[in-house]
Amino acid sequence: DTVIMIRSGYRKFVTFPSPYLLKKGCYMPSVDLVDMFLRLAEKYGMKFYFGLYDSGKYWDTGDMTWEVEDNKYVIDEVWENYGSKYKSFGGWYISGEISRATKGAIGAFHALGKQCKDISNGLPTFISPWIDGKKAIMGTTKMTKEDAVSVQQHEKEWDEIFDGIHEVVDACAFQDGHIDYDELDAFFSVNKKLADKYGMQCWTNAESFDRDM
Protein backbone atom coordinates (compact mmCIF):
# COMPACT_ATOMS: atom_id res chain seq x y z
CA ASP A 1 0.00 0.00 0.00
CA THR A 2 3.04 2.30 0.23
CA VAL A 3 5.89 3.20 -2.09
CA ILE A 4 8.92 5.16 -0.90
CA MET A 5 11.42 6.91 -3.15
CA ILE A 6 14.59 6.84 -1.08
CA ARG A 7 15.96 10.06 -2.56
CA SER A 8 14.86 12.46 -5.28
CA GLY A 9 18.41 13.03 -6.41
CA TYR A 10 22.04 12.32 -5.58
CA ARG A 11 24.69 14.89 -6.45
CA LYS A 12 24.03 15.81 -10.12
CA PHE A 13 21.46 13.12 -10.96
CA VAL A 14 17.83 13.97 -10.15
CA THR A 15 14.48 12.27 -10.60
CA PHE A 16 12.43 15.34 -11.54
CA PRO A 17 13.12 18.61 -13.41
CA SER A 18 13.75 20.84 -10.38
CA PRO A 19 14.33 24.43 -11.59
CA TYR A 20 16.50 25.10 -8.52
CA LEU A 21 18.70 22.02 -8.91
CA LEU A 22 19.00 22.36 -12.70
CA LYS A 23 20.24 25.92 -12.16
CA LYS A 24 22.86 24.52 -9.79
CA GLY A 25 24.21 22.24 -12.51
CA CYS A 26 22.22 19.03 -12.05
CA TYR A 27 21.32 17.06 -15.18
CA MET A 28 17.88 17.24 -16.76
CA PRO A 29 16.25 13.81 -16.25
CA SER A 30 14.88 12.13 -19.38
CA VAL A 31 11.68 11.19 -17.51
CA ASP A 32 9.92 12.99 -14.66
CA LEU A 33 9.95 9.98 -12.34
CA VAL A 34 8.21 11.77 -9.46
CA ASP A 35 5.20 12.56 -11.64
CA MET A 36 5.19 9.01 -13.00
CA PHE A 37 5.36 7.40 -9.55
CA LEU A 38 2.59 9.65 -8.21
CA ARG A 39 0.33 8.89 -11.18
CA LEU A 40 0.89 5.15 -10.81
CA ALA A 41 0.41 5.31 -7.04
CA GLU A 42 -2.90 7.11 -7.59
CA LYS A 43 -3.95 4.54 -10.19
CA TYR A 44 -3.32 1.62 -7.82
CA GLY A 45 -4.49 3.25 -4.58
CA MET A 46 -1.03 3.49 -3.01
CA LYS A 47 0.59 6.20 -0.89
CA PHE A 48 3.85 7.71 -2.19
CA TYR A 49 6.53 9.04 0.17
CA PHE A 50 8.89 11.58 -1.39
CA GLY A 51 12.57 11.22 -0.46
CA LEU A 52 14.51 14.48 -0.17
CA TYR A 53 17.55 15.46 -2.26
CA ASP A 54 21.05 14.32 -1.28
CA SER A 55 23.75 16.76 -2.43
CA GLY A 56 26.57 14.42 -1.33
CA LYS A 57 28.12 17.19 0.78
CA TYR A 58 27.17 15.48 4.04
CA TRP A 59 28.96 12.31 2.92
CA ASP A 60 32.02 14.40 1.98
CA THR A 61 32.17 16.49 5.17
CA GLY A 62 30.31 14.60 7.92
CA ASP A 63 28.19 17.74 8.51
CA MET A 64 24.45 17.26 7.95
CA THR A 65 23.78 21.03 7.91
CA TRP A 66 24.74 21.15 4.22
CA GLU A 67 21.60 19.25 3.25
CA VAL A 68 19.17 21.83 4.65
CA GLU A 69 19.83 24.66 2.17
CA ASP A 70 19.13 22.79 -1.09
CA ASN A 71 16.16 20.97 0.36
CA LYS A 72 14.49 24.22 1.43
CA TYR A 73 13.91 24.91 -2.26
CA VAL A 74 13.25 21.29 -3.25
CA ILE A 75 10.48 20.88 -0.64
CA ASP A 76 8.74 24.05 -1.82
CA GLU A 77 8.98 23.07 -5.50
CA VAL A 78 7.78 19.53 -4.94
CA TRP A 79 4.78 20.47 -2.85
CA GLU A 80 3.71 23.15 -5.33
CA ASN A 81 4.17 20.97 -8.43
CA TYR A 82 3.14 17.54 -7.13
CA GLY A 83 2.03 17.38 -3.51
CA SER A 84 -0.83 19.82 -3.84
CA LYS A 85 -2.06 18.06 -7.01
CA TYR A 86 -1.88 14.32 -6.23
CA LYS A 87 -3.90 12.60 -3.51
CA SER A 88 -1.30 9.80 -3.61
CA PHE A 89 1.35 12.14 -2.14
CA GLY A 90 1.33 10.59 1.31
CA GLY A 91 4.41 11.82 3.15
CA TRP A 92 8.09 12.64 3.25
CA TYR A 93 11.27 10.63 3.73
CA ILE A 94 14.08 12.75 5.19
CA SER A 95 16.83 10.95 3.34
CA GLY A 96 19.95 11.92 5.31
CA GLU A 97 21.31 8.72 6.85
CA ILE A 98 23.16 8.75 10.17
CA SER A 99 24.03 6.14 12.75
CA ARG A 100 25.41 8.08 15.70
CA ALA A 101 25.35 11.58 17.19
CA THR A 102 26.38 13.42 14.00
CA LYS A 103 27.35 17.05 13.48
CA GLY A 104 24.29 19.09 12.55
CA ALA A 105 21.93 16.09 12.48
CA ILE A 106 19.36 17.14 15.08
CA GLY A 107 19.12 20.67 13.66
CA ALA A 108 18.92 19.42 10.07
CA PHE A 109 16.29 16.75 10.77
CA HIS A 110 14.24 19.26 12.77
CA ALA A 111 14.42 22.00 10.11
CA LEU A 112 13.56 19.63 7.25
CA GLY A 113 10.84 17.78 9.16
CA LYS A 114 9.22 21.05 10.22
CA GLN A 115 9.24 22.49 6.70
CA CYS A 116 7.80 19.27 5.22
CA LYS A 117 4.99 19.15 7.78
CA ASP A 118 4.23 22.89 7.68
CA ILE A 119 3.87 23.03 3.90
CA SER A 120 1.80 19.83 3.59
CA ASN A 121 -0.64 20.31 6.48
CA GLY A 122 1.10 17.77 8.67
CA LEU A 123 1.75 14.84 6.31
CA PRO A 124 3.94 12.20 8.00
CA THR A 125 7.74 12.29 7.93
CA PHE A 126 10.27 9.57 8.68
CA ILE A 127 13.99 8.82 8.80
CA SER A 128 15.92 5.59 8.22
CA PRO A 129 19.26 5.54 10.05
CA TRP A 130 21.67 2.65 10.27
CA ILE A 131 23.05 1.09 13.44
CA ASP A 132 26.82 1.46 13.83
CA GLY A 133 27.29 -2.28 14.27
CA LYS A 134 30.03 -4.73 13.37
CA LYS A 135 28.96 -4.84 9.70
CA ALA A 136 29.05 -1.04 9.23
CA ILE A 137 32.25 -1.23 7.21
CA MET A 138 31.52 0.90 4.12
CA GLY A 139 34.69 2.53 2.83
CA THR A 140 37.01 -0.01 4.48
CA THR A 141 38.54 -3.28 3.32
CA LYS A 142 37.43 -5.18 6.43
CA MET A 143 34.56 -7.65 6.74
CA THR A 144 33.69 -6.50 10.28
CA LYS A 145 34.87 -3.75 12.61
CA GLU A 146 36.09 -3.90 16.19
CA ASP A 147 34.69 -0.62 17.53
CA ALA A 148 30.99 -1.34 16.95
CA VAL A 149 28.56 0.67 19.05
CA SER A 150 27.26 -0.93 22.25
CA VAL A 151 23.53 -1.22 22.90
CA GLN A 152 23.91 1.20 25.84
CA GLN A 153 25.73 3.85 23.79
CA HIS A 154 23.22 3.43 20.93
CA GLU A 155 20.39 4.06 23.40
CA LYS A 156 22.09 7.13 24.90
CA GLU A 157 22.78 8.79 21.54
CA TRP A 158 19.36 8.04 20.01
CA ASP A 159 17.58 9.19 23.18
CA GLU A 160 19.19 12.59 22.60
CA ILE A 161 18.40 12.60 18.86
CA PHE A 162 14.74 11.58 19.33
CA ASP A 163 14.38 14.21 22.06
CA GLY A 164 15.39 16.86 19.51
CA ILE A 165 13.31 15.71 16.52
CA HIS A 166 10.18 13.90 17.74
CA GLU A 167 7.89 16.91 17.25
CA VAL A 168 8.51 16.94 13.47
CA VAL A 169 9.63 13.37 12.65
CA ASP A 170 6.83 10.84 13.00
CA ALA A 171 8.61 7.52 12.44
CA CYS A 172 12.05 5.97 12.49
CA ALA A 173 12.90 2.89 10.41
CA PHE A 174 16.31 1.61 11.50
CA GLN A 175 18.17 -0.37 8.84
CA ASP A 176 18.77 -3.89 10.12
CA GLY A 177 21.76 -4.90 8.01
CA HIS A 178 24.72 -3.57 10.00
CA ILE A 179 24.45 -5.68 13.15
CA ASP A 180 24.82 -9.39 13.76
CA TYR A 181 21.71 -11.57 13.68
CA ASP A 182 21.95 -12.35 17.39
CA GLU A 183 22.07 -8.63 18.22
CA LEU A 184 18.77 -7.80 16.51
CA ASP A 185 16.59 -8.35 19.60
CA ALA A 186 18.70 -6.16 21.88
CA PHE A 187 18.97 -3.23 19.48
CA PHE A 188 15.39 -3.42 18.24
CA SER A 189 14.01 -3.57 21.80
CA VAL A 190 15.84 -0.31 22.52
CA ASN A 191 14.57 1.25 19.29
CA LYS A 192 10.95 0.43 20.21
CA LYS A 193 11.37 1.65 23.79
CA LEU A 194 12.77 5.00 22.60
CA ALA A 195 10.11 5.43 19.91
CA ASP A 196 7.37 4.76 22.48
CA LYS A 197 8.97 7.24 24.91
CA TYR A 198 8.79 10.03 22.34
CA GLY A 199 5.48 9.12 20.70
CA MET A 200 7.12 8.09 17.41
CA GLN A 201 6.32 5.07 15.26
CA CYS A 202 9.00 2.37 15.16
CA TRP A 203 9.38 0.93 11.66
CA THR A 204 12.05 -1.41 10.28
CA ASN A 205 14.09 -1.14 7.10
CA ALA A 206 14.58 -4.82 6.29
CA GLU A 207 17.72 -5.14 4.20
CA SER A 208 17.21 -8.35 2.25
CA PHE A 209 20.94 -8.95 1.77
CA ASP A 210 23.77 -9.67 4.17
CA ARG A 211 26.83 -7.45 4.40
CA ASP A 212 29.30 -10.12 5.54
CA MET A 213 28.98 -12.51 2.60
Residue spans of the language-model regions?
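Glycan-processing catalytic domains of CAZymes
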Residues: 1-213
